[in-house]
Amino acid sequence: MAHKKGASSTRNGRDSNAQYLGVKRFGGQVVSAGEIIVRQRGTHFHPGAGVGRGGDDTLFALTPGAVEFGTRRGRRVVNIVAAAAAE
């Protein structure tokens, strides 16, 4: 069993594409309906009031307003509060 694979052979040349995950709109930022708030794998953040969850666990705004991060029952949640109430 050769451990040297021979001339013109390499074990390198693999790299995965970037996933572009993370928080896209931070607390206090005003969003419109449909805007992506968090891209994630799994539910690191859970949807709260005015927030929907996509099939890939992406959180997005269902209503216009300001983004608010908080906790509920020990979970990190993202809510949308009315823009007038946020000011």
UniProtKB/Swiss-Prot annotation:
Biological process, per Gene Ontology: translation
Listed SUPFAM superfamilies: Ribosomal L27 protein-like (SSF110324)
Database matches in InterPro entries: Ribosomal_bL27 (IPR001684), Ribosomal_bL27_CS (IPR018261)
Keyword field contains Glycoprotein: no
Gene Ontology molecular-function annotations: structural constituent of ribosome
Pfam family, one: Ribosomal_L27
An example Gene Ontology CC term for this record: cytosolic large ribosomal subunit
Parts of the chain that traverse the membrane: none
Entry keywords, A to Z: Ribonucleoprotein, Ribosomal protein
HAMAP family referenced in this protein's UniProt entry, alphabetically: Ribosomal_bL27
Similarity annotation: Belongs to the bacterial ribosomal protein bL27 family.
Protein name: Large ribosomal subunit protein bL27
